[in-house]
Amino acid sequence: GETGLPVILSCGMSTLGDIDEAVRAFQETGNDRLILLHCTSSYPTPSSDVHLRKIESLQQIFDMQVGFSDHTEGPVAGLLAASMGACMIEKHFTLDRNLPGPDHRFSCGPSELAALVKGVVAAREMMGDPKLGPTEREGASRNDFRMSCIAAKSLPAGHRLLSDDVTFKRPGAGLPPN
């Protein structure tokens, strides 16, 4: 805390009490640049033990940025974590999975890391805007894809409409179906 540098605090193997104690101790230094890292310290971590919802729990409880320490095989957990608001993804990296040591066999290689980064960028973009309503692109093509209520056949003026007299077709530039 004295340097003012950001600190990344892994929550692997920690209870809520452990995390709370560490966060409080850190905050007492006056440095507010702390990121909690949701982590399952199991190598590799099976899907059933990832528990990505803990990211949201940590965000709500501590009201701070939360990242994800990914020890799974493949990119799925990292992509999901990004879509759930993880501010950073930590992923083990190797140039060769056959190297000795416990981390290499589940680490990602250069092409996988590039794909993960590209996927995280796309996932964040896909999260979009929570505001309901058509997007700008949808608005531009709305009339082309929506339907209008139209006469199913030629009808004389003053004719009393029956259900067989109308149909619905594109484009939606006419009378709306509602």
Residue ranges of predicted features:
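Catalytic cores and adjacent flexible loops of soluble metabolic enzymes
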Residues: 1-178
